[in-house]
Amino acid sequence: MSGEQTEQISKDKAVAAEQARKEQIAEGKKAAESPEVERRKKNIAEIAKLNEKAREAKKQATEQEETTTSLLERFNLLKEWHLNQQVNNKVKNPAMESETEPALADELKPDMSNLFARPTVTDLQKMKWNAESNKMATADDMAFIEAEFQSLGVPKENLAKVMWTLTRYCVGASSSQYLDPKGEEEKLCGGVTRAALIACIKKRSTLRKVCRLYAPIVWNYMLVNNVPPEDWQSKGYTEETKFAAFDTFDFVMNPAAIQPLEGLIRSPTKAEIIANETHKRIALDRNANNERFANLGSEITGGKFGCRVGTKWRESKCDNG
């Protein structure tokens, strides 16, 4: 073997050894770096999973929010529909006969110039009628009384309350023409006495007629405040009928009287009506002993009161047969 060949072989071996050394170094580095790389890759994978879960959670939250919004909108629409159904006025039993008029034949139509004309039901429905009673004060009477009250110094803004309190006073004290009123309503009447107010009333009407006009109002007042007439027990009324123990009870349901805005709290019971009529009969009989005298001169009366009207209440018996 020549020297050149030997030299070439030595170079090749040196190159191979150098290559082997480099590969060994590379493998050593690779072996040293492998755990760190794996850890990084693992972390990257976990981060990717977390990001994916976050995106999924966000997507679900968005879908849930959209669903909630949709349900809320539907709920609001449903609530609005129900609110629209809540109306105060509902027509019931709609038999609206007054909407149409019968097509009467000409020969049946009433001749309004003839006093003997026969009205139809429609004609009667068209007639406007205001309830009136000659047993209570009229609007003309009340206009005069109101003017008198104001001229005495009763504040204008208190006129209605003054009349309410005055008629309520008469519930306990009486509405008789012989009533001797005491006291005054200082806060309402501006210092005007009850006696002066009642005197003004008597110029034009009677106290009882005025009290009848306000009977429904004092009735409601007593019921809503649970304050019956003060003398109910002394008049012989029972616990069940005590609210009927006043003079003008029989005008509580009179449509010509001034009505409370909401109407009567309740109507009088049969027991209350019977009790009031009974007491009225007793009171009239007690005061009727002198009614048969045509003249009250002593020559006629002999200086004595008349005989008491005899009413045999205790002999009234029920027929049990």
From Swiss-Prot:
A family per Pfam: Flexi_CP
GO terms under cellular component: helical viral capsid; ribonucleoprotein complex
UniProt entry keywords in alphabetical sequence: Capsid protein, Helical capsid protein, Ribonucleoprotein, Virion
Keyword Amino-acid biosynthesis assigned: no
Record localization: Virion
Positions with biased composition (Basic and acidic residues): 9-39
GO molecular function, one term: structural molecule activity
Region Disordered, residue ranges: 1-43
Transmembrane segments: none
Superkingdom of this protein's organism: Viruses
InterPro entries in the record: Carlavirus_coat_N, Pltvir_coat
Ribonucleoprotein listed as a keyword: yes
Similarity remark: Belongs to the potexviruses coat protein family.
Function: Required for genome encapsidation. Forms ribonucleoprotein complexes along with TGB1 helicase and viral RNA.
Record protein name field: Capsid protein
Species whose genome carries this gene: Poplar mosaic virus (isolate ATCC Pv275) (PMV)
